[in-house]
Amino acid sequence: MQDNLIYLANCFLNEAIKTTLQNLNKVNIIDTPELYSFVKGINTDYQFNKSTKLANDCNLDKEKIVNELITQLKSNSFFENISSVELEQNKSVKINGKKTNTVIKQIMITLNISKLYLSNRINLLYKRILSGSSIYVPNTITKKIIVDYSSPNIAKEMHIGHLRSTIIGESICRVLEMCGHDVYRINHVGDWGTQFGMLIAYIKNNQIESYTISELMNIYKESRKLFESSIDFKNQSRLETVSLQNGNIESITIWQKIHKISMNSFHEIYSLLGINNLITKGESFYQDQMTELVNSLTSDNKITVENDMKLMFVEGISKPFILQKSDGGFTYDTSDLTALKYRLFIEKADHIIYVVDSSQQEHFSQMFQIAEKLDWIKNQQLQHIGFGLVLGSDGSKLKTRSGETIKLQDVIDNVVSHASNITRELIKQKNLDWNDDDILTISKKIAINCIKYSDLNNPRLNNYKFDINKMLNSKGNTAVYLMYGLARCKSILRKVPNNTVLNGDIIIENENSRNLLLHVLKYVEVIDQTVETMCPHYLCIYLYDLIGSLTKFYTTNRCLEYDNDNLIGYNANNLRIVNMVKIIISKIFELIGLEEIEQL
């Protein structure tokens, strides 16, 4: 926490409160001074609004406590420009049962972080960056963390619903790795169960030798119709499911082919999204262990049997956790609980995170309670990271005209097409000589960045509208605006004739440079906040505000001097600031999975 500015400011505030109370002979009046904290100031870095409450809690005159508190804060070199502001507020209060208006006076303490402290911290950070060290120094013990995300179903194309899990999950992994943790990305694909008996039966009956992922989708739809309408096909499907579970060579061969075609399709999308190191460990991996788990829980009398089903119940949830159906088949519940046990006892994870939509909250609550009930949890942490739906631009569920879920590949292709049209128009306006391959490459990068940022920029628990025109806009809080901000930094630095000018101290020369550098130092706060909440949108807020501060910096701080398009001079200090900001922007780009573009 040593680089987290708000944490440091509040620590110093708490120390000042303790000393103030000691000096006013009010020792131990307040057990938890940490309940008092700064908030963001309107025209200053921070303000303390609870001096009246503090005075009332201690039965002291508020002016006396404010004066003493200011004295203590002034003795700390972390702060400067400390002052008090008295505010009058009209408030309705009850006196003898009657409402009456009264004027309440509040005293607010405002202050800034000192220029000396900012200068020291900025230059320490800049030297760390130039030496190749990490911009973030972890303060936590390294943990083994498993993040379960994406998890599409085999034999089906990835759809728009998989987008959020994949993008949010990957960003969380990158942030946790930056914090020094050992992160294992797990893709818990749906690759087992009755649906594969249906597929295998249909493929055998129709002697289908080859198929694409789209054709597999159609095979699944047709087999589902037959399963629901034909008793004979339903029985055949169940027999094929048993045959698959028993390791029949022909059944396994067909299953492996379906699996391979599906995974190849998934990897094409993962490659576009920049998703690497995602280990596929689906339901089939735990198949043998499911039987062992259910038998063990049965013999230990941990299971309730109702209508030949094996169930478990937890407090507060009436819906049963189904471990075995009446026909002996296993369920989604069974595979998830088996996977959890494997991750705890075999893979020995310290922290397991499930990035799955919010509709599954009850399921994970049940499973976590069962794990505690079975005494599986010691010091490990289990966490469900839920998220809202992807909606159309009109606020309705994103569907095709026929009412089907939109394929993720179609979404990506559509955004790439729009980005390509915009890119071609800009190239035409600027008379640039780009070939079709260059246009497609840059358009793909823009499209993927826009898809990711449009998702991550929204609080994950909220539904968000998928609006192509809005996400590709070059103005406002969009990926295109951010990419332009980074490209401008790179363009300025490319024109510097001698990179050695980037070495040296950074000097805070004016208000815009101070505001920009203060924002740079808040990167620790935003990373800590992201880890604490598992909400990557805080990184997006920080990034947008940082580039906004950089834009203001340019208005009063010239970096390069030109005479008739000839470079005649430069400001080394301003170039160092731009270089530092560029590196911070690049790191945040990396954490949210955006790809950098040299020229935009």
Swiss-Prot record:
Provenance organism: Acanthamoeba polyphaga mimivirus (APMV)
Gene: RARS
Catalytic function, reaction form: tRNA(Arg) + L-arginine + ATP = L-arginyl-tRNA(Arg) + AMP + diphosphate
'HIGH' region (motif): residue ranges: 152-162
NCBIfam families, A to Z: argS (TIGR00456)
Residue positions binding L-arginine: 151-153, 162, 332, 336, 360
PANTHER family: ARGININE--TRNA LIGASE, CYTOPLASMIC, ARGINYL-TRNA SYNTHETASE
Cited CDD domains: ArgRS_core
Pfam families, per the entry: DALR_1 (PF05746), tRNA-synt_1d (PF00750)
Name of the protein described by the UniProt record: Arginine--tRNA ligase
Alphabetical UniProt keywords: Aminoacyl-tRNA synthetase, ATP-binding, Ligase, Nucleotide-binding, Protein biosynthesis
Record-annotated disulphide pairs: none
Stated family: Belongs to the class-I aminoacyl-tRNA synthetase family.
Top-level taxon of the source organism: Viruses
